[in-house]
Amino acid sequence: MNKQNFHHISVLKKEAIDFLKIKPEGIYVDATLGQCGHTIEIANLLQQGFLYSFDQDVEACTNAKKTLSPHLPIEIIHSIFRIXSPISTTKSFSLDGILFDLGLSSCQIDNPQRGFSYLHNTPLDMRMNINQTITAQYILNNYSFAQLKNIFKLYGEVKNASLVVSEIIKQRPLQTSYDLVSITDRFCNLQKGHSAKKIFQALRIEVNQELESLKQALEQSLDLLKPNARIVVISFHSLEDRIIKHFFKKHSTFVLPKKLPIAIIPQTPLSIITKKAFLPSEEEMQNNSRSISAKLRVAVKNV
């Protein structure tokens, strides 16, 4: 792919960097490298510090290594952050901060070959890591009625999932995005936005195991952050945001056992910085429509 054909604008870039409170000597992780927008900003603020940037998309890693200055204190790691990574298995240090930007990059969305968009008639792929075997096409043509219905209801919140799945099974094999859109146009045309939006979201989440990966990555981050380190997360739909809110609440709330004779109030692992999600400004939403659904949440490590 010629990366010059696609233009990506990082969402809430300044706000995310400000919330991280970068220390020049600190050690940081950008858990979702993407098109390097946040990575470059973090690296430019480091002096004696270092940044580890992760991405499971080999194309993103390759482009980053070509684009980034070799003098910047960065190591690019082709891996999803939740998988046993170099920093969690071989490095004996703690982190001063970690950033998760959970959105797809414009390069992934706008590249027809990746199969993420319902606006192009391309093979139903949707893999962020092209080395994995499961594609959206495989799921549509091989999953059972119950499995597909569950995916669409849980990950897409599709109201008439049964009708959609019945037609998918009837029309098998589905090969391209337009094969699927022809079905969603008939059975999902009353939902807000494009008829295929929620179906494609559900498939993408299943293909890449996005929600399970997020849960594991958040839990892993707790073990790597030093006291006063910050975790900054930018989400783009309610399913992600729900997981983040639950994680922050779970680790910032202490439930006193009923049988304890005295009230002990220990320090919780996290304190929440953003009591409500921080949203893009009106100006940013006007300049970058893909920022409209973004929510930023921040917590600080206590112990």
Curated annotation (Swiss-Prot):
GO MF term set: rRNA (cytosine-N4-)-methyltransferase activity
Keyword terms, alphabetized: Cytoplasm, Methyltransferase, rRNA processing, S-adenosyl-L-methionine, Transferase
Keyword Lipoprotein: no
Catalytic activity: cytidine(1402) in 16S rRNA + S-adenosyl-L-methionine = N(4)-methylcytidine(1402) in 16S rRNA + S-adenosyl-L-homocysteine + H(+)
Subcellular localization: Cytoplasm
Function (record text): Specifically methylates the N4 position of cytidine in position 1402 (C1402) of 16S rRNA.
Full protein name: Ribosomal RNA small subunit methyltransferase H
